[in-house]
């Protein structure tokens, strides 16, 4: 699955590089070529959106414990896509103003100044938004790192607990084995004592029989 994601990543990188280059060229092109270039960029932006959707689907299939890194990369790609779309909108606005000025002459100069001022304010807002997104991403990454550390600590605690349980079981088994061996040793000693007593009794009986036999003669 990760190979598919990386393949989409490479396609997305190549495509966004082409889009960036074409957006930068739009202001310097003649009117006819600009129109064609704008249409071409629109088509490539749609292809880039489709690639992002495919990458997003791939990320959703990744197990949760391995998804964090890919999710961060997806956020970065979406931010890059948003910047491309913003740059393209500016390029289209400039292109539309240029076409309109060619049709209306100097009558649109004041409107163009207002639009430039509006674009400047929009750019400031977008920079602030990007800073907020970067701060949010850092906070999310920090939270994920903390969560991973807690999970690792939890796993380590479980391992220690299992090892402790195994030691406790082994200690209990050793105690049980010791009791069994002690009982067996006690029975062996008792059996040997009985054998000695029986041997003594047999010897005494034999000696007594011999004594009676000698006295009888």
Swiss-Prot record:
Name of the protein this chain belongs to: Vesicle transport through interaction with t-SNAREs homolog 1A
Known partners and oligomeric status: Interacts with distinct SNARE complexes that contain either STX5 or STX6. Interacts with NAPA and, to a lesser extent, with NAPG. Identified in a complex containing STX6, STX12, VAMP4 and VTI1A.
GO biological process, one term: vesicle fusion with Golgi apparatus
Membrane-topology descriptor: Single-pass type IV membrane protein
Function text: V-SNARE that mediates vesicle transport pathways through interactions with t-SNAREs on the target membrane. These interactions are proposed to mediate aspects of the specificity of vesicle trafficking and to promote fusion of the lipid bilayers. Involved in vesicular transport from the late endosomes to the trans-Golgi network. Along with VAMP7, involved in an non-conventional RAB1-dependent traffic route to the cell surface used by KCNIP1 and KCND2. May be concerned with increased secretion of cytokines associated with cellular senescence.
Annotated Pfam families: V-SNARE, V-SNARE_C
Coiled-coil zones: 31-92, 112-178
Main localization of the protein described in the UniProt heading: Golgi
Keywords: Coiled coil, Golgi apparatus, Membrane, Protein transport, Transmembrane, Transmembrane helix, Transport
Keyword presence, GTP-binding: no
Residues spanning the membrane: 193-213
GO molecular function: SNAP receptor activity
Expression (tissue specificity): Widely expressed.
Topological domain ranges for the Vesicular compartment: 214-217
GO cellular component, one term: neuronal cell body
InterPro entries noted in UniProt: GOSR2/Membrin/Bos1 (IPR027027), SNARE (IPR010989), T_SNARE_dom (IPR000727), v-SNARE_N_sf (IPR038407), Vesicle_trsprt_v-SNARE_N (IPR007705)
Subcellular location: Golgi apparatus membrane
Gene encoding the protein: Vti1a
Assigned protein family: Belongs to the VTI1 family.
SMART domains: t_SNARE
Cytoplasmic compartment spans: 1-192
Source superkingdom: Eukaryota
